[in-house]
């Protein structure tokens, strides 16, 4: 790990609040009445109810959505036996992933106990607190005994993710890979490099799914695990000892269909790959350097399918595809265990997601990636929104069918709808955008290159690799401010600076601006003056002339001033009536989009309809299916005046032209975001679930609502997103944060990619 990364990580963890987790109160605590319910005397009622019926704990407490991530720190990532306390940052990180991907609450518990039996006694005493236990970073072979003992003693799920999470995702890759090459598990021969906890769990799961044990040959750092071997053997490894003359990996790989590597870098040689069967499946999962690099495999076996543990190659085997969702399904049915049936359901659900045709939502979220089932797409993307709905539901159903569910689900359609809401509760909504931006970064010019926020954002953009920043400003000022801010980026190395006063393209841009504005009272001399002095103008001309791919401006100066320049130089896309804006708000309880917050003071019905349609396309870029509500002081006809009639007309227009859209109005704000309230007032509303795209009747309503929600709700904003422009350009605001600039950079890069692909 580089010193620079070390320092950044230490600052990240030390920033207030310390660490990565916090506990929040979920019930009102504002009045004496609230306190009397939360604690004494009112709390006695749920206590007595649970005493009478233990299953009520999931109804009256957080236990049903609470798991423990537990370790003794004996096998921490690549750090080894660093101890319980030193492992805490890793356990907090694991807890954060559970919360981020599946909205599961977690306590991380680090136990300084290396005796397996005493460790089990301590953990068993925690059963009353948790709905499930995720064992983490416990060394083999003790981890096998610990998990088996706890599974026998406890009536809640116990899951060692290092074993079974890896096994599930590996098995899904194998199932998908064999489908692609037309082979079956029953007829395949598999060799492994590595015989630790994860490798043995992979083998156990594949055997339970139909891989004959006689078709498996295992090797470790000593060599082949053969019948009669005594060196570094244990009862778990001995189950896969074979009567064979092979003693090395090279000996045993002849004719193998599958290579499973969970061992060390570079143990598989290219010449070994040439000995494998036709169309071999190679899972080289050592991290960060695999057993063999994919390009080395392809050089000698172009017919091979390769999986790694790395995100920079196709087919990443990543446990995050599994552990949040298998626990989500297990908790939701009150499972007493995570059994083989549930694990196999998870395997097949993952493979089915990859094999199925992605929805429009997924295609937009991962646009221009190869999402067609095949050699380079065996597993879903980690941020595929279908993971939580498909995997969790499959696991829940398997728990019910195998008899370990204590709270069976009656309506799976309603359950899937509830699961889909978890996707939109955090900044995870931005991750598909960032992932795509990183794959094909574009040149983004920033009009306010000297602004501190722009400079700090540029550093993050360089670090994340989502764009090539080009800053408009004076090089000396930018370099000095970057130094003052302790930024590591350097002009000419990882950022570019363009000073309009001295830029070689000044004359050409001035002439171009004159051509655009000659009929608007701008002389050649005035054109040069404007281009030289207005950084927004210069940046917009760079975009128009194709010298950059996208543009952001607006952090300094009035929005309208920037808008005027954008209208002059970039203009509207073909067929668009007028520009408008959309703002996204990522709040703790959901993600919402509001329009038009910045441009059209009092839009007509036609303008409302247009901005709604343009907004729908943008919302889908985030992997979110838009549910549109047009808001008003009138609630489904309670008022009949010009304002309500305008909104009503826009709804009719949209329904006529886009009958497939989930859209309704005119309605109150509370009816839009609460299906319960909406049904009370108007049971026949076409809108299902809660609206996430709120079209306001005028700019006053939109801007006030957005700014209040942002401040009071503590949300992260994305935008303003400029709708209807002829190029990827967006105007930020003077209140934009560094994070907001970074978010909009990623979004603008994706827009540039899409426009380029369409041209």
Write out the residue ranges for each language-model feature.
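Glycine-rich adenosine-cofactor-binding loop
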Residues: 66-78, 83, 167-171, 181-207
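N-terminal ligand-binding/catalytic initiation module
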Residues: 2-158, 397-398, 405, 431-455, ...
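Adenosine-phosphate binding glycine-rich loop
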Residues: 157, 161-162, 181-187, 284-392, ...
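A short, aliphatic-rich alpha-helical micro-motif
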Residues: 127, 185, 252-253, 273-276, ...
């Amino acid at each position: 790990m580089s010193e620079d990364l070390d320092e950044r990580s230490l600052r990240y963890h030390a920033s207030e609040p310390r660490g990565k987790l916090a506990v929040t109160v979920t019930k009102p605590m504002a009045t004496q009445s609230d306190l009397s319910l939360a604690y004494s005397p009112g709390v006695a009622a749920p206590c007595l109810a649970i005493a009478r019926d233990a299953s009520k704990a999931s109804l009256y407490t957080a236990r049903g959505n609470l798991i423990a991530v537990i370790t003794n720190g004996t096998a921490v990532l690549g750090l080894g036996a660093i101890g319980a306390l030193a492992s805490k940052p890793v356990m907090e990180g694991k807890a954060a992933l559970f919360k981020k991907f599946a909205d599961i609450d977690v306590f991380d518990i680090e136990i300084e106990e290396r005796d397996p039996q005493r460790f089990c006694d301590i953990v068993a005493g925690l059963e009353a607190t948790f709905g499930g236990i995720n064992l983490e970073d416990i060394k083999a072979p003790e981890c096998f005994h610990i998990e088996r003992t706890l599974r026998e003693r406890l009536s809640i799920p116990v899951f060692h993710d290092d074993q079974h999470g890896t096994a599930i995702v590996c098995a899904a890759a194998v199932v998908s890979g064999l489908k692609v090459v037309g082979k079956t598990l029953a007829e395949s021969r598999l060799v492994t490099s590595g015989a630790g906890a994860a490798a043995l769990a992979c083998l156990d799961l594949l055997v339970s799914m139909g891989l004959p044990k006689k078709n498996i040959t295992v090797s470790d750092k000593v060599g082949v695990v053969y019948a009669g071997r005594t060196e570094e053997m244990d009862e778990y490894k001995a189950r896969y000892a074979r009567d064979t003359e092979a003693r090395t990996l090279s000996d045993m790989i002849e004719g193998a269909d599958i290579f499973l590597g969970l061992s060390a870098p570079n143990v598989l040689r290219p010449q070994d790959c040439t000995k494998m069967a036709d169309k071999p499946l190679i899972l080289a999962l050592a991290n960060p350097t695999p057993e063999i690099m994919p390009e080395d495999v392809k050089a000698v076996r172009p017919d091979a399918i390769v999986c790694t543990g790395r995100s920079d190659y196709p087919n990443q085997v990543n446990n995050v595809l599994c552990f949040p969702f298998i626990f989500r399904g297990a908790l939701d049915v009150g499972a007493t265990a995570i059994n083989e049936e549930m694990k196999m359901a998870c395997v097949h659900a993952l493979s089915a997601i990859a094999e199925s045709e992605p929805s429009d939502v997924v295609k937009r979220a991962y646009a221009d990636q190869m999402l067609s089932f095949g050699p380079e797409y065996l597993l879903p993307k980690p941020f595929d929104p279908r993971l939580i709905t498909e995997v969790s539901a499959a696991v829940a159903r398997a728990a019910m069918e195998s008899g370990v569910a204590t709270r069976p689900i009656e309506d799976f359609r309603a359950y899937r709808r509830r699961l889909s809401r978890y996707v939109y509760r955090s900044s995870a909504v931005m991750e598909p955008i960032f992932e795509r931006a990183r794959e094909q970064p574009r040149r983004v010019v920033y009009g306010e290159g000297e602004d501190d926020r722009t400079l700090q954002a540029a550093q993050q953009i360089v670090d994340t690799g989502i764009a090539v920043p080009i800053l408009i400003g004076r090089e000396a000022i930018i370099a000095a401010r970057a130094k003052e801010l302790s930024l590591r980026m350097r002009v000419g190395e990882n950022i570019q600076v363009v000073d309009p006063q001295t830029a070689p393209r000044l004359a050409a841009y001035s002439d171009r601006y004159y051509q655009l504005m000659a009929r608007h009272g701008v002389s050649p001399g005035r054109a040069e003056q404007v281009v030289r002095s207005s950084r927004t103008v210069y940046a917009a001309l760079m975009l128009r002339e194709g010298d950059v791919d996208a543009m952001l401006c607006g952090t300094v100066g009035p929005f309208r001033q920037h808008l005027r320049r954008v209208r002059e130089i970039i203009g509207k896309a073909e067929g668009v009536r007028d520009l408008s804006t959309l703002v996204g708000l990522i709040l703790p309880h959901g993600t919402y989009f509001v329009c038009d917050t910045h441009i059209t003071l009092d839009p007509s019905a036609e303008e409302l309809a247009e901005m709604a349609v343009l907004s729908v396309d943008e919302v889908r870029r985030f992997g979110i299916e838009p549910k549109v509500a047009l808001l008003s002081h009138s609630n489904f006809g309670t008022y009949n005046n010009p304002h309500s009639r305008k909104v009503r007309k826009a709804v009719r227009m949209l329904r006529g032209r886009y009958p497939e859209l989930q859209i309704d109005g005119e309605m109150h704000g509370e009816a839009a975001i609460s299906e319960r309230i909406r049904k009370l007032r108007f049971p026949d509303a076409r809108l299902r679930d809660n609206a996430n795209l709120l079209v306001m009747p005028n700019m006053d309503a939109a801007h006030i609502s957005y700014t209040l929600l942002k401040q009071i709700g503590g949300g992260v904003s994305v935008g303003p997103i400029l709708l209807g422009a002829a190029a990827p350009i967006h105007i930020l605001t003077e209140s934009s944060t560094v994070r907001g600039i970074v978010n909009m950079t990623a979004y603008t890069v994706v827009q540039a990619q899409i426009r380029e692909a369409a041209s």
